[in-house]
């Protein structure tokens, strides 16, 4: 259903005379936790206290349509949870692959990002997790601001929910669910990549 919706949105957009490419960076502050579901029947989900951290990385954006773009990121993200006063800090390298929709005027636009992501825990400070590979969904919304010569700036609120788990979740394990999730506030900047055939930037 989601795939059909995405195809419908893209095909309904006016195409650009020449595809546009953007490169940039982004980063911000995160608040991460883990949603645990005990394996015992009748037990309620347990959300641990948050760990505060940060994220940062690179942004690549392809614009073939005026308001609907394809965006890929390579990001470092600090995740984890706090339990009994002890912080369990996890450091991930993540690859979100997003549909980027934006609406509005020539200078300021509202945007929405949605798509899957995969990641890998490159450092576990507590040496507690058993499943370093991660995958899940990412959704974010915010405002972007276009300048004449200094690129495009944006501010975004983003939510990430892991569909994998940091621990085993089989019937013999302690938890039936151990899913990381985090909320972040990010600032970013992208610049159009120069092309041989110079046309007016139409996507922003």
Task: Describe the predicted segments one by one.
Residues 19-21, 48-54, 89-95, 131-137, ...:
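Residues that define the transmembrane beta-barrel architecture of outer-membrane proteins
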Residues 179-204:
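Outer-membrane beta-barrel "beta-signal"
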Residues 25-31, 72-76, 112-120, 143, ...:
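Transmembrane beta-barrel strands of outer-membrane/channel proteins
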Residues 1-8:
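Bacterial N-terminal signal peptides
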Residues 35-42, 82-88, 124-129, 166-172, ...:
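Outer-membrane beta-barrel translocator domains and adjoining extracellular loop/strand segments
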Residues 13-15, 44-48, 60, 85-87, ...:
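Outer-membrane beta-barrel proteins
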Residues 12-57, 188-190, 204:
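Short glycine/proline- and aromatic-enriched beta-strand/turn motifs that initiate or cap beta-hairpins
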Residues 19-21, 58-125, 149, 191:
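Gram-negative (and chloroplast) outer-membrane scaffold detector with strong preference
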